[in-house]
Every structure is written in structure tokens, then in C-alpha cells.
Amino acid sequence: MNHFQLHQVITTPLPVKNDIEILVFKTNLTDTKRIGDIESLLDIHPHIIQWNVDLNDCDNVLRIVSRNVAAQEVENILLNAGYYCEELQ
């Protein structure tokens, strides 16, 4: 006679960060030409919902509304395009 023992496995789902967050960066995006240089890079990112640059701010602030985007990732995108970018705390 075969005896089978059933085991119930209880799993807890891994936490998924679905919260929308706003990231703010100091940049050297000082004019519309420079902003145009990075526009397509930010527009095609699947987790960046919205972004803008405040040219009237002394830090030329880049503001990104996103889901699951690390600040370092944004900094690298701009650095690879030849621009300065540092997260503001």
C-alpha cells in the first residue's frame, strides 16, 4: 500500500514597492537644448511617470515622479549622457 503525505506550503509574497515617489536632483541642465538631450532617455524609461526641469531654480532641479526607480539609476542616465546629476536630500 502506498502512503502519500500531503504537505501544505504556505508562502508569503515578497514585498513589492508599488508606491509612487518623487525624486529630486541638482543638475547642470541649464537650457532647453540640454533638456532635449536627455528627454528621450527619460521618456522611454518604463517606470518614470513624469519629469520636469526647473530652469528658474539655481540648482536646475530635475523632478521625477516614478515607481521603482533608484536615484542612482537616474544619476547614471544623466552621467552617461554627459550631464551632472546629484540627488537632493
Task: Name each model feature, range by range.
Residues 16, 52-53, 82-89:
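Conserved short beta-strand edge segments in small beta-sheet-based binding/regulatory domains
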Residues 28-46:
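Short amphipathic alpha-helix segments
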Residues 27-29, 63-68:
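Short beta-strand-to-loop capping motifs
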Residues 12-29:
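Short glycine-/aliphatic-rich beta-strand segments at the starts of folded cytosolic domains
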Residues 6-11, 43-50:
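Short amphipathic beta-strand starts and helix->beta connectors
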Residues 67-88:
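C-terminal structural segments of small proteins and small subunits
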Residues 55-59:
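Short Gly/Ser/Thr- and Asp/Glu-enriched loop/turn motifs at secondary-structure junctions
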Residues 1-12, 17:
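Terminal low-complexity, intrinsically disordered regions
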